[in-house]
Amino acid sequence: MERFENCLYREVCDYEEPCRNACVRYSVTKYMLEHSNIPKSKWGIHKLIPDECDMKAFENLAYIRDNIVEFTDNGHSLYIYSDTCGNGKTTWATKLVLQYFNEVWEHTGYNARGVFINVPTFLYQCKSNISRPSQEFEELRDSLFKVDLVVWDDIAAAKISDYDFSTILSILDSRVYKQKANIYTSNISPQHIESYVGAKLASRISKGITIQLKGGDKRNGSTASSSFENLSV
């Protein structure tokens, strides 16, 4: 029963209850999640209801979600930005990765397929790893060159150093060359990101689909029109 209570699919799974101990969907998805670096608080179903000003943005994000395999297979790039914190950028990015896991689990085996990176934390860990090497971190960093889909959360949170620049550029250059998909979240508009990360990184990050969220901070209890509830996911 423990397996059933902790399964992300318990409310939508069409398999008979009780869960089988050898459920492949559960074990493969759990493996992908455990190797994704997605915070456990983001593993479950988080409903988002857009403010009226974000209706079109949510529709566009829902379209990408519904076609996430095509998005990923074609190596597309998505830049979600807003000058407001807490209005769904990170939640949407993780939703897209989770949907990808949901679509590909049956043909995945026990392999990492997507990774979530909080950019400020990752850059700090890169520097710390020089003096205090961590095999777990090195495996995470190496996976960024290989997995199908990477979320770069909170990119351009601050101006980056030359070391930070070379670290991210080497990974992104490899991913772009291999046609690997990337999702970025930021509080900086595409027009201003160059002043934070430089021209080379800016050209890679902002090249692709850009979606702006304008709504209020959902973490502080911002309300939204119930007429858009059908768009909540």
Where are these regions (language model features)?
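Short glycine-rich substrate-engagement loop in P-loop NTPases that contacts/grips substrate
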Residues: 55-62, 81-87, 100-146
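Walker A/P-loop nucleotide-binding motif
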Residues: 72-94
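Conserved catalytic network of the ASCE P-loop NTPase/AAA+ motor domain
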Residues: 71-72, 106-109, 142-145, 173-178, ...
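Loop/turn-to-beta-strand initiation segments
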Residues: 113, 146-149, 178-184
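A short, basic N-terminal segment
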Residues: 1-67, 209-211, 218-233
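Active-site signature of alpha/beta-hydrolase-fold catalytic machinery across serine-
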Residues: 95-99
